[in-house]
Swiss-Prot record:
This is tRNA dimethylallyltransferase. Monomer. Pfam families: IPPT (PF01715). ATP binds at residues 9-16. Its cofactor is Mg(2+). Substrate binds at residues 11-16.
Amino acid sequence: MHPAILIHGPTASGKSALAIELARKLGGEVINADSMQVYSDLQVISARPTEEEMAGVPHHLFGYVDAGRRYSTGEWLESARSVLKRLQRQNKHAVIVGGTGLYLLALTQGLSDIPPVPEDIRAEVKAISESEGADGLRLRLAPHDPELAERLGTGDRQRLARAYEVWLATGRQLSEFQNERQPPVLKEGEWVGFALTPPRAALYKKIDRRFEGMLMQGAVAEARALVSRNLDPELPAMKALGMPSIAAFVRGEISAEEAAESAKRESRRYAKRQFTWIGRQFPFWPRIPSPEVSDRMRVIFALYREIDTADTEDYA
């Protein structure tokens, strides 16, 4: 069995292009690990590879979920497990690529078996979050999970809301579930991960250019189609990078210029958070700072050859 190659990195760092070239070189297949690229309605806004870019390389778990659904990490993990089993039977290389670190952690470290939160509790916590903010959530969570409430402070409203809704639904701390992880799909020795860490200044400029290109390529039309469906703004697809700003423009709440600047700013902030995540969650993954695909290929094959000697000829 060939070890799977995992590619992670911040938004706009060139993950998809690299994954496609790796899969093409190895005769392998690409598996998506980006939580927004699973949605069929977000071709442009999620920067999902186009049909032309994917040509000749089989791709999996891209654009197959409706934006009206809450698609969980557990659902993705089971879908990825199915694809990986088939590729292993066929002795094919798997290149798993995406900016959703939680997906990659679940794949390689296991996933906590947290029961689904009922919609009425989700709605209750959402109302608290909107009316009382992170301060209110922290105060409500503190009596039940003081350690997590202290660690999160008021800087992560989404995680505070998640921890509080889990406690309301189960009466247990989120950390209890996290300490009861299922066995990972990919065990030690069955995968190797690489983190793309291009220079930040250049990356931020690329983020700005890419978003400007998205506006030209149909991002507004995608947002308009979703706004017309009156979907819950708290759905994951409606919170994709750039979507809230473009949706506000579609509704006439802000100008096109304001939408563009807001989306660019949030994308840069998100990239910064992804760099932080990589440092904390993947401290031992080899870093590849070069933005050039050829350099990245050489680094990956040099290391990959040490654990898998088949089909890893030099990339020139």
